[in-house]
Amino acid sequence: MSASILILATCHQVLADFNSYVVPQPHAQRDHRQDISQHYDYLMEENDEPLGRGAAPSKYRSSHGQAQHRPEMTESENFAQPNTESVFSSGGVDSYGETRDFLQFLRRIQYDHRQVPENEKGEATYVEVSVVVSNIRAVSEVTMDYALELFYRESWRDPRLQYDRKLFKNKTELALHESYTNFLWFPDTFVPNAIASKNPQRNSISHRSLLRLDETGKLLYSRRISLVCECTMDLTLFPFDKQLCKLGIESYGYTADHVVYKWSKGARTALELKKIRLPDFTIQEAYVTSQMESYATGNYSRLYVCFVFSRSSGFCFLQLIIPSTAVVITSWVSLWMETETEFQDMISIILAITFLIFSYNEMMPRVSYIKAMDIYLGVCFMIVFLSLIKLALVKYMRQKIMLTSDSGNSLREMSQMSTRQRLRARKTSNMNFRNNGGGSIPINEEHQQMLTVPNGEDKMANGDDKEANNNGKSHLSDMLEIRITQRTMHRFHWISQMLFFFGFVIFCLFYFLIYPNLHIVSVDPACDKNLAEWFADIY
């Protein structure tokens, strides 16, 4: 027991000695950041929305995390206050010393990020824009929009940011951290025809931006953007159509008197396309234009990126054109079938092409004009329907021919029976004459009538046959006004089949070779090729 107590006391003494020995921690970097952050009274934290028409006033976030209106600043403090905590915690591109020097430089020149840069001549600030399209994910005619991912780069000169390279270790260009976008003036660029923007979250791997400043005060800002933009389509020539989709770039709040956008020239081309493959379209052309847009608040400078998409008709051929053509050919084959189920087959064929038309309408947008595919499916449906009408006529002709044949057979049988009766009567009279020894014995009146009136009877029989035939002809002529024979039916059947076949072939040649060139596609004035400033290479 005493040994256990001694061991516990020894352990307690060792732990006490270890706690009393504290290794000093390197707090220099942390204290250095605290000193810099305490050097400023206010921390800037701007919203992502650019300053412009209808923009909310600038805000700063207090120590309690609540957004408050910025208090009035003295003249010496009227510049962009840096959020040093975000700068240093994220670890800028440059060293802490260079970052501190740039912050002191902004303080010394009393830089105000809310003020538009002013040139010496009082001209507007020119913003040079270049776009690199990395991917176009989808072009949808149902929702009439398209999705694309691009690298957007804009460059402008701010005379207030000119610096002496000696202040930054003789560097002619500074690579600034993306958090400096809160401290410098930026054009309030927006895309007028954008429906949605799927930008990645900040500080994520997919969200990166680039910010550079050279000694002349020229800024270069680049970032990755993902957009879904509307594209008004004309589907008159579907599936042989070409669609013109555009991407607008404009300042939201600054008129052309303050900010003018123009396409970049020189090392950074205005538009560049990576190797892009689309399932339903091919990019035929891509070019850029610029123009002025007038609003109630003034004139604004706008840039356009124009894409010309040519539809790949493979999907429509496999899903619509080939099945509808097969249905038409099947309707022709059923006309040559001599079965009682040919009408059921034709009804099934009509239901098949009707279902094909309904499924096509479900995948297309509701428009008020006729599309090229509507014409093709309509002609196929008309041919199948006319084939059904032709089948009914042929069946009617066949029944009439059978009725005519049956009536003729009955008349021939009646005439043959009367002829046999007359021959039998003649034979009986001759036998009676021989039995009388060839004398001139008068014969019975009945036999006399049968012997003396055979020619008249034959005439009457012939007259009855002619009358019956005339009655049959008049009855059929009342129905069809022509004499229907087996030859007539086969001739009608053959001629109609040839008309269907050659008519459909001529229609297909006209539809695929001539019709796509008859329609004149209207050109958007904003994407007039004659005004294009740059054409991108298509890979």
UniProtKB/Swiss-Prot annotation:
Changing residue 280 to N: In sa6; Defective enteric muscle contraction and shortening of defecation cycle. Reduced fatty acid uptake by intestinal cells. Expressed in the intestinal and anal depressor muscles but not in the sphincter muscle. Also detected in the RID and SABD ring interneurons, the ADE sensory neuron and the PDA motor neuron. The chain crosses the membrane at residues 315-335, 345-365, 374-394, 494-514. Gene3D superfamilies: Neurotransmitter-gated ion-channel ligand-binding domain (2.70.170.10), Neurotransmitter-gated ion-channel transmembrane domain (1.20.58.390). Residues 48-93 are annotated as: Disordered. GO terms for biological process: chloride transmembrane transport; defecation; lipid transport involved in lipid storage; positive regulation of intestinal lipid absorption; positive regulation of muscle contraction; potassium ion transport; sodium ion transport. Its main location: other. Keywords: Cell membrane, Disulfide bond, Ion channel, Ion transport, Membrane, Receptor, Signal, Synapse, Transmembrane, Transmembrane helix, Transport. The keyword Amino-acid biosynthesis does not apply. Residues 1-16 form the signal peptide. Coiled coil: none annotated. Residues 17-314 are extracellular. Disruption phenotype: Defective in enteric muscle contraction resulting in abnormal defecation cycles and moderate to severe constipation. Belongs to the ligand-gated ion channel (TC 1.A.9) family. Gamma-aminobutyric acid receptor (TC 1.A.9.5) subfamily. Interacts with tax-6; tax-6 may be involved in negative regulation of exp-1 activity. May self-associate to form homodimer. This is Gamma-aminobutyric acid receptor exp-1. The lineage of its organism: Eukaryota, Metazoa, Ecdysozoa, Nematoda, Chromadorea.
